[in-house]
UniProtKB/Swiss-Prot annotation:
The keyword ATP-binding does not apply. It comes from the Bacteria. Keywords: Ribonucleoprotein, Ribosomal protein, RNA-binding, rRNA-binding, tRNA-binding. This is Large ribosomal subunit protein uL5. It comes from Tropheryma whipplei (strain Twist) (Whipple's bacillus). The lineage of its organism: Bacteria, Bacillati, Actinomycetota, Actinomycetes, Micrococcales. InterPro entries: Ribosomal_uL5 (IPR002132), Ribosomal_uL5_bac-type (IPR020930), Ribosomal_uL5_C (IPR031309), Ribosomal_uL5_dom_sf (IPR022803), Ribosomal_uL5_N (IPR031310). One of its GO terms (cellular component) is ribonucleoprotein complex. GO terms for biological process: translation. Belongs to the universal ribosomal protein uL5 family. Part of the 50S ribosomal subunit; part of the 5S rRNA/L5/L18/L25 subcomplex. Contacts the 5S rRNA and the P site tRNA. Forms a bridge to the 30S subunit in the 70S ribosome. Gene3D superfamilies: 3.30.1440.10. This is one of the proteins that bind and probably mediate the attachment of the 5S RNA into the large ribosomal subunit, where it forms part of the central protuberance. In the 70S ribosome it contacts protein S13 of the 30S subunit (bridge B1b), connecting the 2 subunits; this bridge is implicated in subunit movement. Contacts the P site tRNA; the 5S rRNA and some of its associated proteins might help stabilize positioning of ribosome-bound tRNAs. One of its GO terms (molecular function) is tRNA binding.
Length: 183
């Protein structure tokens, strides 16, 4: 039986690593920045009023990422938001390994081009440590979600965690991978 390697991972190893090594004058292949994990987070503030809303968020993130997300719960009660301690407030899925590369490939080639009036994502959302976070306003751009079965529009935050120490190296890595940054 042959071992399957995601196509974006193959492209990273064969094409992108040599380009980054020459661009940043890196001698050791292990110093080249790579992606560690991708965190997909969806906050569900209305779950305080209706507990069934969190089930829809769990099913959507499960379909999109291919793994069951963790339910985030409130750490403390906040009366103004009618929030009680222990209530579900969101879902988070952390992708690593093959699932991460497959999700990234689907995101870049299928999902982002389906956004209406899409002009690219901002390249100013790096955190100073080489990690990149951006938000999507609806889950319907993913092919896994059936448009007729959407009960409500849910946005999500996607964080790409890299081994890069600087934003410039991370920006170069993500640009080479195919992230459509605004010019």
């Amino acid at each position: 039986m042959t071992c399957y390697t995601p196509r974006l991972l193959t492209r990273y190893r064969e094409e992108i690593v040599p380009v980054l090594m020459s661009r940043f004058d890196i001698n050791n292949v292990h110093q080249v920045p790579s992606i560690t994990k991708i965190v997909v987070n969806s906050g569900v503030g209305d779950a305080a009023r209706d507990s069934k809303i969190i089930e829809g968020a769990v099913s959507d993130i499960t379909l999109i990422t291919g793994q069951k997300p963790r339910i985030n719960r409130a750490k403390q009660s906040i009366a103004k938001f009618k929030l009680r301690e222990g209530q579900a407030v969101g879902v988070t899925a952390t992708l690593r390994g093959r699932r991460m590369w497959e999700f990234l490939d689907r995101l870049l080639t299928l999902a982002l081009p389906r956004i209406r009036d899409f002009r690219g994502i901002s390249d100013k959302q790096f955190d100073g440590h080489g990690n990149y976070t951006f938000g999507l306003s609806e889950q319907g751009i993913f092919h896994e979600i059936d448009q007729d079965k959407i009960d409500r529009v849910r946005g999500m935050d996607i964080t790409v965690v890299t081994t890069s120490s600087s934003d410039d190296m991370a920006r170069a890595l993500l640009g080479e991978l195919g992230f459509p940054f605004k010019k």
